[in-house]
Swiss-Prot record:
Biological processes, Gene Ontology terms: carboxylic acid metabolic process; coenzyme A biosynthetic process; methanofuran biosynthetic process
The EC number(s) this enzyme carries: 4.1.1.11, 4.1.1.25
Enzyme class at the top of the EC tree: lyase
Similarity field: Belongs to the group II decarboxylase family. MfnA subfamily.
Protein function: Catalyzes the decarboxylation of L-tyrosine to produce tyramine for methanofuran biosynthesis. Can also catalyze the decarboxylation of L-aspartate to produce beta-alanine for coenzyme A (CoA) biosynthesis.
HAMAP family membership: MfnA_decarbox (MF_01610)
UniProt gene name: mfnA
Name of the molecule in the record: Probable L-tyrosine/L-aspartate decarboxylase
Cofactor(s) recorded in Swiss-Prot or TrEMBL: pyridoxal 5'-phosphate
Annotated pathway: Cofactor biosynthesis; methanofuran biosynthesis; Cofactor biosynthesis; coenzyme A biosynthesis
Residues where N6-(pyridoxal phosphate)lysine is found: 242
Superkingdom field: Archaea
Length: 398
């Protein structure tokens, strides 16, 4: 830090230089985030100083959070929904806004562990959860932070969790299962209804990570079951800052039962509320305002159009890639495509270095991963495929 402050002009010149080093979304096919909607940006600015970590001081921002959770509950077929005020949850389903999927996943598993421990279940070994091999890396953080064993079930030929593998991994120390509704690499949806049956049969919790798919699946022509309509689902993570078009950070975690939030509570004697159940103390009221604004502005119709646009882009890139001889690993379920190309790691490297395209790679099998988002356009796809054709031709004939 300087001894004396810089001028406003100097500061913004410095910031603009830093901004110029960021990647413009124009050539990004690798991210599950996108440009926030303009109304979300304006709402964020209006509540920039609001702290949801001290609800009594920011009652207006808290009302917006409650409204967001209510709307998300309706979207995810919760019969009734509530955000606790002063640590009390009044209705059957509770939730709050998080920083994103990682925090939501951590808190969901923390709730599982706390409830099982409160029930005085005795373990013969380390408590464990069973997750798909395709699950997000946030569950590695769960294992590290909470001393929980993470057991990874194998995937079937369509990259969904294999139910036989799940059942084989369950033992007397298992506290819960995890299903993914829109996995990061393939956009695939696990059979949540089947996981629900197994969870209920074994008296286990079932958390659904719908961080990406939560704002996609409900608006598909033929949505698969994944939410609170499925009886065994006990918690859901959903990220408005992805396909919900809100500002970053905007995530959400919903629980079927208020007992989950009760298990997460800690005393906060020096705040305006007596207890707190969130992982972070200070929380952004601006994110609540941004999410509330964009959800009310777009409504179901707006989100349906958003998903339809992204699915049209998905169909276009698959169709045009096939003409070049590149097949998808699976027929896309949502707006994520994994293309089979020769030497995908080298293709990715050259696409970035020569043409500035940002794509990513799936782990197993190796393939070119593309996420078709609202910031992409049909023209982007045409340019990208032209460059992909050039790069693969160079690799075949060095």
């Amino acid at each position: 830090m300087n001894e004396q402050g810089l001028s406003e002009r100097e500061i913004f010149s410095y910031l603009e230089n830093a901004k110029s080093e960021d990647t413009d979304y124009y050539r990004v096919f690798s991210s599950m985030c996108t440009r926030p909607h303009k109304i979300a940006i304006e709402a964020n600015r209006l509540f920039i100083e609001a702290n949801l970590g001290d609800l009594g001081l920011f009652a207006g921002a808290h009302k917006l959070e409650q409204e967001v959770v209510r709307m998300l509950g309706n979207l995810l077929h919760a019969s009734s929904i509530d955000v606790p005020s002063g640590g009390l949850c009044q209705s059957s389903v509770c939730g709050y806004l998080t920083t994103g999927g990682t925090e939501s996943n951590i808190q969901a598993v923390r709730g599982m562990k706390n409830l099982v421990t409160a029930g005085k279940k005795e373990f013969k070994g380390t408590p464990n959860i069973v997750i798909p091999a395709s699950a997000h890396f946030s569950f590695d953080k769960v294992a590290d932070m909470m001393g929980i064993e993470v057991r990874r079930a194998s995937l079937d030929s369509e990259f969904r969790v294999d139910m036989a593998s799940v059942e084989k991994l369950i033992n007397e120390n298992t506290i819960g299962l995890v299903g993914i509704a829109g996995n990061t690499e393939f956009g695939q949806i696990d059979p949540i209804d089947k996981l629900s049956e197994v969870a209920l049969e074994n008296e286990l919790f079932l958390h659904v990570d719908a961080a990406f798919g939560g704002f996609v699946i409900p608006f598909l022509e033929k949505p698969q079951p994944f939410d609170f309509k499925v009886p065994g689902v006990t918690s859901i993570a959903i990220d408005p800052h992805k396909m919900g078009l809100s500002t970053i950070p905007s995530g959400a975690l919903l629980f079927r039962s208020p007992s989950f939030l009760d298990s997460l509570k800690v005393s906060t004697p020096y705040l305006t509320t007596k207890s707190q159940f969130t992982l972070t103390g200070t929380r952004s009221g601006a994110s609540a305002a941004a999410t509330c604004a964009v959800m009310k502005y777009l409504g179901y119709e707006g989100y349906r159009k958003n998903v339809q646009y992204c699915m049209e882009l998905t169909s276009k890139i698959v169709e045009e890639a096939r003409k070049l001889g590149f097949e998808p690993l699976i027929e896309p379920v949502m707006n994520v495509v994994a293309l089979k190309v020769p030497n995908p790691d080298l293709v990715r490297e050259r696409l970035l270095k020569k043409f500035g395209w940002n794509v990513s790679i799936t782990r197993t099998p190796r393939a070119l991963r593309l996420v078709l988002m609202p910031h992409n356009s049909p023209e982007d796809i045409e340019l990208f495929l032209e460059d992909l054709k050039k790069v693969t031709a160079e690799i075949k004939s060095p």
